[in-house]
Amino acid sequence: MAIINKGMSRRSFLGLTGSVAAVAGLGLTGCGGSSSDEGSAASSTDSANRGGGVITAGSAYAPSSFDPASTGSAVGLGANWHVVEGLYGIDYHDYSTFNELATDDPKSVDDTTFEVTIRKGAKFSDGTEVTADDVVASYTACAASATYAPFFQPFESIEAKDASTVTVKTKVPNFSLLKDRLAIIRVTPATQTEEDRAKQPIGSGPWMYDSISDTEITLVPNPEYNGEYAAEDKKIQYSILTDPTARVTAQQEGSTLVMELVTADAVDQLESAGCKIDNVQGFGTRFIMFNVAKEPWNDVKVRQAVMYALDTEKMVSNTFAGLATAASCYLPKSFTNYHEASTVYKTDAKKAKKLIEESGITPGAITLRTTDNEQIKGMAAQVKNDLDALGFDVTIQTDTSPATYAAIDGGEAYDILLAPGDPSCFGADPDLLLNWWYGDNVWMQTRCPWKESAEWQKLHGLMDEALAAEGDEQQKKWNECFDIIADNAVLYPVVHVKTVSASWGDPSTAPTARPSMASRALARRACPSGALRPSRRKTRLSLYAGCRPLGPYPHS
C-alpha cells in the first residue's frame, strides 16, 4: 500500500521496513538476519563486532496491560512484537506479511479451509515447545476480546490438526487478507493466564521481558529463540517519558538513542544537537466522538454543526505546526483506498449556526472530555473557542487515557470526547480500519452507542459486501462506507497527523550514549503511524507510537 512519504530518500530511511499508523519511525538494529540490504550503514568492522550493547528509547506513552490478546497500550503493543511471535508478522513499510512461527504460506485445502505449519523446534522463553494448541488458545483469547473480535469476523474457526499444524476455516471464500489477520494473533502459552499475560507475556520471539515497571521496560535476548532474527544486543530499554520536555532532554543529552513524538517546538533544538528528525504522514487520527445516547448529540444536525464550527486550519497551524492534515475522508490521502467523502467538514461558522437553528436546540453547558496527550490538549483550547462561539458553554476535562475510558465505560454521561487513535498498527486495509471503531464492539455498543441505528446497520451491510468483493466493486462499497460515517459524524477524524521521531543517526556521537556496533548501524524506516516497529528483515526497536487508543487500555 502506498502509505509512506515517497519523497524520502533511501539514504534518509535506510532499509525502510516498517510502517503503519503512519509517520516517521526510526529503528535500531537489535537482531540479526539474512538480508544484506539492511546493514549497509555499518562498515565491515561494524559487522564483525556488532552486538553486545544497550538500545535505549524514549517512550511517550505509559504502559498498562501487555496482554497480546487485548492490549491497547501503545508501548505494550510495540514491545510485544519483539517478544511474542505470531504465525505471521507484518512489515510496516508496505504492510506485506512474512513468516514468523509459520514455515510457509497457508496451504489451501479448499476455498475456506487452510493449514499452517509451525516452525520446527520453536520454543517459548520458558523452555516449553510452541504447539498448535497454543495458537488455538491465543486465537480464542483474541476473538473473545471486546475490541479485537471484529478483526476475526471473517473466521469460522482455528483448530489444531496435530501438534504442529493448525486448520483455519474462513467464512469468506479465498480470503485475501488471511495472513494479515493471522498476524494479529500473537502466540503465548495456552497455560499462561490472562492476568499473567497482562503483566508480562511469554513469547517465542528473539527477545523476552526482563522487567516491566511504570518507568521502564527492559527486554533481553530469548535463549530459546531458534528463528532467523536472533537478538544481537544485550538489552532493549524503554524509558517511559510521557512529559515531552523530559523526553526531549533525554534525547538531546543522549540518554536515549531514539525518541517518539517530537513536539513541533523541539525539532530545531534536536536537529541543532545533532539528531536526525523524520516525519511521515499517516493514519494517526485526532478524533472527536459524541455521546449519541445523550441529547442533543443524538441529532445529526447538531453533530454536523460542531464539525463545521471547528477551525481545523488553526489547529493544524498552531497545535501541529503544519504537521497534520484536516480530514477529508476516514482515510488520509496517502492511503491507496482514499476517496474524498461526500461530506467534508471545512470550517464554516455560518453553516454551523444554521444547522443549530434547524435542529431547534438551544446550546448550553457541555463538557469536552480529553486525554492528556499534548496535541489533544492544544486542540481542546481551539475546540472550546469554536464551540463557545457557536453558543455552547464548554468546560474542558482532561485525564489520562485509562481514566478517561474507564469513566466512559463506567457509564459517565459525557458529551464530547477528543482523543488520539490509530488502529493501523494492526493493518491498513479499510475493512480492518473501519471495524476498529465502527465494528460490533465496545466503541459502538457503549462508548458511542450507534449500533442500534439504521445507519449503522446499513454501514455494516456495505462492509460485508466490500469484504466479499474485489477490485473496483470493492472500492465502490468502501467509498459508500466512508460517506456514511462522514455524513453521520458520530466518531470521526478531525485531523490525520504526521508523527515526528528523532534519533542519533550515528549513535556514537550522542553526548552520553554508549551504543553497541549494532546500534551504530542505525536503520530508519517509515512507520505510517509514527511508531518504531519490527521489520521482516531485522527486528527493530518498536515504540508503537502511532497505535492508540486500543480497547480497554487505550493510550494517548
Q: What do these predicted ranges mean?
A:
Residues G58-V109, T140, I202:
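N-terminal lobe/hinge region of extracytoplasmic solute-binding protein
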Residues H93, R181-A231, K235:
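Gly/Pro-rich hinge or "lid" segments in bacterial periplasmic/extracellular proteins
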Residues T131-S138, A163-T167, G205-P206, D233-K235, ...:
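Alpha-helical secondary-structure segments
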Residues P150-A190:
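Surface-exposed binding/hinge segments that line
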Residues E195, E224-Q269:
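Ligand-site clamp/hinge motif
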Residues A321, T325-E358, E374-G378:
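Structural transition elements
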Residues T395-T398, P402-T404, L432-G505:
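Extracytoplasmic/peripheral linker and loop segments enriched in polar/acidic and small residues
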Residues S501-R537:
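Long beta-strand-rich cores associated with HINT superfamily self-processing modules
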